[in-house]
């Protein structure tokens, strides 16, 4: 297991929203000073980074981007949250999803797959190339508002482009309520049940889940699976099938980019981010 110096001093920082339970875990691990709103950031030095949670905090993110303040963005983890209660949360330095691949050890990944009951399905099975339909996963309101897109326009344009370049049927999967997306309603079940050939999405975590399950993906906006996804929908019949060794190294990196609340509360998450320059 990667050794982390738990006694190293964490520099001063800020955290928005003392009422948020996940932010509270990060605050406990970093001893961050709470502020109640992004509007209060102007009262603090730009040298102080700030922890922010969820795309609903887009004004805080935009404020940091405009002023050059570092921020730690916290949201749903990429993998392993198939159960009712989310276990893993991504923490991204100066971004919404991780984009700078890092070659890291495989220890966290092995812990996920070998030691966590019910996560054995995460092992990359190799590419599945004999599927039928295209699964189109639509964006929810939050990313649409954050990136300034019109959901229906994106959907119409995407469907039209796909239909120009393939005769495969298109199945649309809307995000819906969380309880509808876990257990039997998980995307993994649908990939199998509908024998999906490829997944198309805006920047949903569905791309990450599909790639790890051996189904290629196409994306429109930055996400952690970028390096393994095709962006050009005119190539819908010829998806990107990266080497297995690269997919596995990517999975090791994904495991280093998400954390439990306990890892946040002990400062382990922060120290891993800084040690491996994860962003």
Predicted segments, located by residue:
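A basic- and aromatic-enriched beta-loop-alpha substructure that forms the phosphate/nucleotide-
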Residues: 57-110, 204-205, 212
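Donor nucleotide-activated moiety binding/catalytic core segment of transferases
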Residues: 37-43, 163-218, 222-224
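Short loop/turn segments at strand-loop or loop-helix junctions that form parts
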Residues: 6, 74-78, 131-143, 173-176, ...
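N-terminal pre-catalytic "stem/leader" segment of glycosyltransferase-like enzymes
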Residues: 1-49, 54, 142-143, 272-279
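Short, well-ordered secondary-structure micro-motifs within conserved domains or adaptor modules
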Residues: 37-66, 70-74, 196-203
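Leloir-type glycosyltransferase catalytic cores
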Residues: 83-131, 227-279
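Hydrophobic beta-strand scaffold residues
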Residues: 34, 70-72, 78, 170, ...
């Amino acid at each position: 297991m990667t050794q982390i110096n738990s006694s190293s001093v964490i520099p001063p920082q800020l955290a928005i929203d003392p009422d948020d339970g996940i932010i509270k875990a990060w605050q406990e691990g970093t001893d961050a000073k709470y502020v109640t709103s992004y509007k209060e950031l102007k009262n603090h030095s730009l040298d102080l980074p700030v922890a922010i949670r969820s795309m609903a905090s887009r004004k805080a993110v935009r404020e940091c981007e405009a002023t050059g303040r570092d921020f730690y963005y916290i949201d749903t983890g990429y993998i392993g949250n198939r159960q009712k209660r989310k276990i893993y949360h991504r923490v991204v330095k100066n971004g919404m999803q991780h984009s700078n691949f890092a070659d890291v050890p495989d220890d966290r990944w092995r812990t996920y797959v070998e030691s966590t009951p019910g996560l054995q399905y995460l092992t990359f099975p190799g590419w599945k190339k004999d599927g039928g339909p295209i699964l189109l996963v639509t964006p929810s309101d939050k990313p649409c508002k954050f990136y300034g897109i019109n959901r229906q326009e994106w959907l119409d344009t995407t469907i039209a482009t796909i239909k120009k370049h393939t005769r495969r049927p298109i199945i649309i999967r809307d995000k819906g309520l969380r309880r509808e997306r876990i257990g039997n309603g998980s995307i993994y079940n649908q990939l199998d049940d509908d024998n999906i050939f490829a997944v198309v999405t805006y920047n949903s975590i569905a791309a990450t889940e599909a790639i790890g399950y051996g189904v290629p993906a196409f994306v429109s906006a930055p996400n952690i699976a970028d390096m393994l996804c095709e962006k050009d929908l005119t190539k819908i019949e010829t998806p990107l099938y990266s080497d297995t060794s690269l997919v596995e190294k990517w999975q090791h990196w994904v495991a280093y980019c998400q954390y439990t609340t306990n890892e946040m509360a002990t400062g382990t998450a922060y120290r891993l981010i800084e040690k491996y320059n994860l962003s």
